[in-house]
Amino acid sequence: MSRVIVIGGAGQGRQVIDAIVARGHHEVVGVLDRSFRRGDVVAGFPVLGTDDDLRAAALETAADSFVVAIGDNFTRGRILERETGAAAHLHPATVVHPAATVARDASLGAGCILLAGAVVGNGCRIGRGVLLGINSSVDHDGWVDDHASLAPNAATGGTVRIGRNTAVGLGASVIHEVTIGADTVVGAGAVVLGNLPDRVVAFGVPAKVVRDREPGEPYLQRR
């Protein structure tokens, strides 16, 4: 059984810990989060330091894997790419809740997270560090690029392309054969009927671009 360190101890981190425990393929040995003090406890597991302490914490606990359980796509991707390969004995763990469904011919990238009820259809490709929230779904032949996310109850039709670092918000829907660019945010409840470019924010039914955005800009802020 792999021994895993969870980076991120807030709400998303606790959900990921529950998924790991429920699946039983990894043993959680500790949490890294700069919002806590070393020795604090998150979801029953000790805080070992901050995300800067991964290699030291891995040596301390004999961990051989890690998962970045942070909701913000840009931050999650930055940490995952920084730490991948930094130590030969550490690799990014892929976490799939036992209540998630993955088609036999779908592929999952290293470090991705599928929470309870997430569905990945036939022929889908899910990139590195992707986060699929509770009850989200990617229909057949979809492609979700590295570090993108679908929030709870977000859904895509078949053959949809979601760009790197892009966030599809709570309950949003994307119809079939649509392409959404990189670093874009689709607001909660939006219905995307056509392609969206890189680095924009889109809201509404149907979804319309309301402004440009910068890569790394916090996407949970208001318009």
Language model features with spans:
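Short glycine-rich anion-binding loops that position phosphate/pyrophosphate groups of nucleotides
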Residues: 12, 71-74, 208
